[in-house]
Amino acid sequence: MSEALKILNNIRTLRAQARECTLETLEEMLEKLEVVVNERREEESAAAAEVEERTRKLQQYREMLIADGIDPNELLNSLAAVKSGTKAKRAQRPAKYSYVDENGETKTWTGQGRTPAVIKKAMDEQGKSLDDFLIKQ
């Protein structure tokens, strides 16, 4: 809370500050404060009316579903099942390169991600290119 609001919220401090103002100034401040309070009340009542209207509409739709013989929980479950099943998995990329690691095992690499250390070392030290590791089809 800012210092100005702390002053307005404390009656003793407010009285002390009010002694330094004229009555006309205090009345002008009171009018402005009343305007602000009324605006806030209107905003809050409008928000409450929106919530009430939304709740009324939801209840109306629920009653329509029940009248048509549809259980609202069944509808939600079917929507959740459709939503969770929509994410399609993409196919795994085929291997593009083949190499022999330090243990003598033949391994493959798709060409995506970090270059395997064995391939990188061969390219740097032995002057090989990626084409040397291509899988021949």
Swiss-Prot record:
Residues 21-63 are annotated as: Involved in dimerization. Changing I119T: Partial loss of repressor function. InterPro entries: H-NS-like_N (IPR054180), H-NS_C_dom (IPR027444), H-NS_C_dom_sf (IPR037150), Histone_HNS (IPR001801), Histone_HNS_N (IPR027454). This is DNA-binding protein H-NS. The modification N6-(2-hydroxyisobutyryl)lysine is found at K121. Induction: Protein levels rise from about 4,000/cell in exponential phase to about 18,000/cell in late stationary phase (at protein level). Subject to transcriptional auto-repression. Induced by increased hydrostatic pressure. hns transcription can be repressed by overexpressed StpA (which is usually repressed by hns). Induced by cold shock (42 to 15 degrees Celsius) (at protein level). Residues 22-49 form a coiled coil. GO terms for cellular component: cytosol; H-NS complex; H-NS-Cnu complex; H-NS-Hha complex; membrane; protein-DNA complex; transcription regulator complex. Hydroxyisobutyrylation on Lys-121 (K121hib) decreases the DNA-binding activity of H-NS, promotes the expression of acid-resistance genes and enhances bacterial survival under extreme acid stress. The gene is hns. Changing K96Q: Does not affect hydroxyisobutyrylation. Changing Q17P: Abolishes oligomerization of N-terminal fragment 1-89. A DNA-binding protein implicated in transcriptional repression (silencing). Also involved in bacterial chromosome organization and compaction. H-NS binds tightly to AT-rich dsDNA and inhibits transcription. Binds upstream and downstream of initiating RNA polymerase, trapping it in a loop and preventing transcription. Binds to hundreds of sites, approximately half its binding sites are in non-coding DNA, which only accounts for about 10% of the genome. The record marks R12 as: Interacts with Hha. GO terms for biological process: bacterial nucleoid packaging; negative regulation of DNA-templated transcription; negative regulation of single-species biofilm formation on inanimate substrate; regulation of DNA-templated transcription; regulation of translation. A central region (about residues 21-47) is involved in dimerization, but multimerization requires other residues. The dimerization domain (1-47) also acts as a hinge; changes in its structure probably impact oligomerization and DNA-binding geometries. The N-terminus also interacts with Hha, perhaps via residues 2-18; a well-folded dimer is not necessary for Hha binding. The C-terminus (residues 92-137) binds DNA. Residues in the N-terminus contribute to DNA-binding and to discrimination between curved and non-curved DNA. PANTHER family: DNA-BINDING PROTEIN H-NS, PTHR38097. Changing A91T: Derepression of proV expression. Homodimer, also found as tetramers or higher oligomers. Oligomerizes into higher-order complexes that form bridges between adjacent DNA helices. The N-terminal region (residues 1-64) can interact with overexpressed StpA. Forms a complex with Cnu (YdgT). The H-NS dimer forms a heterotrimeric complex with Hha in the absence of DNA; this is mediated by residues 1-46. Interacts with Hfq. Changing R15C: Derepression of proV and bgl expression. It comes from the Bacteria. Its main location: cytoplasm. Changing R54C: Derepression of proV and bgl expression. Belongs to the histone-like protein H-NS family. Residues 92-137 are annotated as: Required for DNA-binding. Changing K121R: Does not affect DNA-binding activity.
